[in-house]
Amino acid sequence: MNIKIILLSIILIIQLLLLNNNGGIVESKINFSKRKQTDRKPNPSPKTYTKEYYDNKYLKSLKNVKQTPNDFLVTDLPGLDNGILTSFSGLLTTNETSDGNLFFWFFPANETVINPMDAPLLVWLNGGPGCSSMDSVFIETGPLRFIGDSDNSDKFYINPWSWHNSANMLYIDQPFGTGLSFVSDNDGLVTNDLEINQNFYQFIQEFFQIFSNYSTLPFFISGESYAGHYIPHMASYILNMNENLSKDSIKINLQGVAIGNGYTHPTTQINSYREFGYYATGIIGQRQYNNYENLNNLCQEQLSQGNYNSDECANVFNTLLDDSGSSNTSQVNMYDYRLNDPTAGNNWPLPGINQEFVYLNRDDVRSAIHATVTPHQWNECNDTVNGLLTNQDESSLYLFPELLSNIRVLIYNGQFDVICNHVGTTEYLNQIEWDYTQEWSDAPRFTWTSVGTDGSLQSGGYGKTAANLTFVLALGGSHMYPMNMPSTSFDMITRFLKNKSFNDLPQSIGIDAPSTPKPVPLTLGAWIGITVGGCAFGFLVGGLIIYIIMKKSSKNGYYKVIQ
């Protein structure tokens, strides 16, 4: 009994040290600090969008695209045996004027589950702005997971809940300067939505010219956080370019978009913080709640004047975080309010983030993924890219009526996210003026039965559907919902892509526990503890693993942890 207590105490101390490790700092997915102003051309107002807006002057002739898929085939990826996973990656030049290059990593659908030609093509974009979509490859929706917790871990197992089991997954680092994407000179970095849309559209055109077999498949765009701003603009741009298709251009078969914990309508979402903090979570009290009315009014005044980069709006969220702490506890983690963090989540050591940083900056890895020409090291987020986009608090909601008239839209929110919380999302969805406003208001709530990682049935969440719009409140989810709820998030995206009802049982649409077991990363049970929010289960399992390893590995008076 005493041995068990000592072991669990050791695990607890080590877990706390790991959770406060400063390595691999996670930068805010939405940076509410004061952003650097720029004298460069502003983002055009929606009222100034004209035909010229859709005349992509950067669009080069696709006849100049000479590469083939084999030029991008990933072979000998360090840490993964050949033949286990097929992927393609590299850089495409989408703006010849600035030598702007976007990095991508493409994972065709898993042939053991679905024929890639029978699956849709799904783009994934992380937010920031300026944060790399490679996070999703290694931590969220992608197939690669590091084994072990060492920063130098270079062995992978395949994520059994990877979204490439339902779709051909295309991860893009955008805009320029994000992740492994680059421009030759920082003057070529983008400053507005128009440039982002043009470069994204050009990228897809070139990608389909090279990977022509996929060009007619159903096309979807997904992402999280600030991608909730990107995606409506990109989808609207594609719809309009399809209507005015230029010579040699490929019509993109856009069928839908999926936005997770998106920053889409700041006017409402910022205003929701006090309701969420007081009524939905209880992380602030009555006194703080009363103080927010004045803070919100100051922010709304700035937004009404077209100032989408104000201290007043940043102050609303920062005050919420400050008020969530006390003299005895740290403030809550902005991405998961079950956790406390002195930096509110900015230093949250996501499982795999340190390994990702080391791995993507290795020369042999850069060579394998065809990114040796990228002149800078990979970082999760780029503050320069973030600072040049000064319209981050501008709404994208006005685009939704057009989108909902043409494509399907899935909006989902992790239950425990603060920064892009479900209260704000629910409120802005109710503000959309479209042909089915009344049907949306009257739509009954559904209770979604999903599948757990062990194959058992569990509640996935709640939501509602009317016409082309679906909203899901994902139980157990954080800001990075696919990270900590892999099975239910896979169930969710599969239903959306197949256009299946959330009222159906998962087995009825072919979703079951995968047959491939997930190996257990063995370093002190830390990954388990972090993934489930530091609960006692992680400590107990971690302690059991340590005890077994110590029993088997004791030699010459010391213990060694074996992976």
Swiss-Prot record:
All ranges on the Cytoplasmic side of the membrane: 551-563
Q: Which residues are glycosylated?
A: N31, N95, N110, N213, N244, N328, N382, N468, N499
Q: Which PANTHER family match?
A: RETINOID-INDUCIBLE SERINE CARBOXYPEPTIDASE, SERINE PROTEASE FAMILY S10 SERINE CARBOXYPEPTIDASE
> What protein name is recorded for this chain?
Serine carboxypeptidase S10 family member 2
Subcellular location per the Swiss-Prot or TrEMBL entry = Membrane
- Main function: Probable carboxypeptidase.
Transmembrane residue ranges: 530-550
Active site as annotated = S225, D417, H479
Please list which residues make up the signal peptide: 1-23
Membrane-topology annotation of the record: Single-pass type I membrane protein
Q: Which GO terms describe its molecular function?
A: serine-type carboxypeptidase activity
Q: Which UniProt keywords apply?
A: Carboxypeptidase, Glycoprotein, Hydrolase, Membrane, Protease, Signal, Transmembrane, Transmembrane helix, Zymogen
Instruction: Note whether Transferase occurs among the keywords.
Output: no
Name the EC number(s): 3.4.16.-
Q: Which family does it belong to?
A: Belongs to the peptidase S10 family.
Q: Which GO terms describe its cellular component?
A: membrane
Q: Which residues lie on this side of the membrane: Extracellular?
A: 24-529
PROSITE patterns listed in its UniProt record? CARBOXYPEPT_SER_SER (PS00131)
Q: What are the recorded Gene Ontology BP terms?
A: proteolysis
Its EC top class is hydrolase
